């Protein structure tokens, strides 16, 4: 067991945030490939890497609770598919990142409904602030919302459900969970790819797909390293840095600049996430003190 080191935990979580935003950007690079092809290839690479990591860490390849691991894998797979659907040529990387960040709010709501957890007042307020931010990003006009926006929001929703299931899998290795999730994604995507037919891949496509899978595996690895140095209650808020990285990546590599309405919505979403983090931590402290 490592000695607690918050600074190292924060550092590795910032590395993870950069990798997550890079993964989203790489998904956009190959926008012309079908969603299921991107999911299949990237998951295949990530599954191979995570399988090797499991062997290196002497962790099992199959989780003990197959029902929960199946739920986590299904929700994670749906989130990935929707994330790639949102990653079109014209949709902003920053918006994809922000909408996927709604996972923390949806995880909070899922924990209340499924795990029967109690929400602190600040967390209730954070939900309303988050949905105000979501409305600014979605910006429905005349009852119409962009398909990419709905896909990004759906990705956040299913990711939130997946993270809630992971909390029930606390006795399982994170490497095993991720290997099962990636393997499930490969198997689930294959029938769709076979029906659509495989697209011819050049060196660029092969390189980007391998890099995407490697970045995903690295993100999962560094996430585990970060939480081995410090508990999530102390450092998880730094995951919101991925939105800043996505914003910068969008400007530098895609020449994208969100308008002030989307930026305002993003600020509300990030603010809601930070409020949720602080309120949840304070509620935990009070509960521990009462006990």
Language model segments and positions:
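Hydrophobic transmembrane alpha-helices of multi-pass small-molecule transport proteins
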Residues: 122-138, 155, 261-280
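Glycine-/small-residue-enriched transmembrane alpha-helix faces in small-molecule transporters
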Residues: 1-37, 143-168, 285-291
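Hydrophobic/small/kink-forming positions within alpha-helical transmembrane segments
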Residues: 17, 21, 25, 51, ...
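C-terminal-most transmembrane helix of multi-pass membrane proteins
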Residues: 2, 42, 240, 244-291
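C-terminal transmembrane-helix exit sites in multi-pass transporters
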Residues: 57-58, 103-125, 244-263
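Membrane-interface helix-cap regions at the ends of transmembrane helices
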Residues: 2-3, 46-65, 75, 130-144, ...
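Helix-helix packing/entry segments at the starts of transmembrane helices
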Residues: 96-102, 169-184, 220-252
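Loop-to-transmembrane-helix transition segments
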Residues: 7-16, 55-84, 146-157, 193, ...
